[in-house]
């Protein structure tokens, strides 16, 4: 997907201090202060334009959500939506997922969502996949013991790779679906990509994976 450059995005987001966090490293260990409560904290890595995370935040007002989207030209769409329809339990970051440990203390995040991540199909790019072992170690470092990853994709290759990567890492699966929309849960929040690929008849793959507590 080719990203459309939006030169105004950075300045616009920085003006929305109640939504966009410019220096998340300053909040490491203190996100409950930012939200003004100690509700569970869920993050989505690769939030796109925010349809999923905003839907989740509306559905679960007693949970705090952080949308993480590397590209400002994409993340600005989330910020705009939050300006139009304020949601006090959502914040937005434009940071690299490799550095999550710089922004969250161990156990500070209660759940990680990975939705329709870039599959990076070439073998030489495997390390860039968000379910590669180094990324799994990063998520494990900020989640509590037995922390969860919820994952959705339309790409069977990435799904099979992720099952293998997580299994080899020592994780176990509490749910696996090879066609989510056959018996779609009532509370499922669809992403933009999910709606698009489902309309084309493409099955949606989903799993919930849990880290095994280490002694």
Curated annotation (Swiss-Prot):
Its EC number is 2.1.1.33. Keywords: Methyltransferase, S-adenosyl-L-methionine, Transferase, tRNA processing. S-adenosyl-L-methionine binds at residues 44, 69, 96, 118. Substrate binds at residues 122, 154, 191-194. It comes from the Bacteria. InterPro entries: SAM-dependent_MTases_sf, tRNA_(Gua-N-7)_MeTrfase_Trmb, tRNA_methyltr_TrmB_bact. It holds the Pfam family Methyltransf_4. GO terms for molecular function: tRNA (guanine(46)-N7)-methyltransferase activity. It catalyses: guanosine(46) in tRNA + S-adenosyl-L-methionine = N(7)-methylguanosine(46) in tRNA + S-adenosyl-L-homocysteine. Pathway: tRNA modification; N(7)-methylguanine-tRNA biosynthesis. One of its GO terms (cellular component) is tRNA methyltransferase complex. The active site is at 118. Belongs to the class I-like SAM-binding methyltransferase superfamily. TrmB family. PANTHER family: 3-DEOXY-D-MANNO-OCTULOSONIC-ACID TRANSFERASE/TRNA GUANINE-N 7 - -METHYLTRANSFERASE, PENTACOTRIPEPTIDE-REPEAT REGION OF PRORP DOMAIN-CONTAINING PROTEIN. HAMAP family: tRNA_methyltr_TrmB. Catalyzes the formation of N(7)-methylguanine at position 46 (m7G46) in tRNA. This is tRNA (guanine-N(7)-)-methyltransferase. It comes from Exiguobacterium sp. (strain ATCC BAA-1283 / AT1b).
């Amino acid at each position: 997907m080719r990203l459309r450059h939006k030169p105004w995005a950075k300045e616009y987001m920085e003006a929305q201090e109640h939504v966009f966090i410019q220096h998340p490293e300053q909040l490491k260990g203190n996100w409950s202060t930012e939200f003004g409560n100690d509700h569970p904290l869920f993050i989505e890595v690769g939030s796109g334009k925010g349809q999923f995370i905003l839907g989740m935040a509306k559905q679960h007002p007693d949970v705090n959500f952080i949308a993480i989207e590397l590209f400002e030209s994409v993340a600005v769409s989330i910020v705009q939506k939050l300006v139009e329809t304020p949601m006090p339990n959502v914040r937005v970051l434009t940071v690299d997922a490799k550095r999550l440990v710089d922004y969250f203390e161990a156990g500070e995040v209660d759940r990680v969502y990975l939705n329709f991540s870039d599959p990076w199909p070439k073998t030489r790019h495997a390390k860039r996949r968000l379910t590669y072992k180094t990324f799994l170690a990063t998520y494990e470092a900020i989640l509590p013991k037995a922390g969860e990853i919820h994952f959705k994709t339309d790409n069977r290759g990435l799904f099979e790779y992720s099952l293998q990567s997580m299994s080899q890492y020592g994780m176990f699966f509490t749910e696996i679906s090879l066609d989510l929309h056959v018996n779609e849960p009532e509370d499922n929040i669809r992403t933009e990509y999910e709606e698009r690929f489902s309309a084309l008849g493409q099955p949606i793959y989903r799993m919930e994976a849990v880290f095994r507590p280490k002694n």
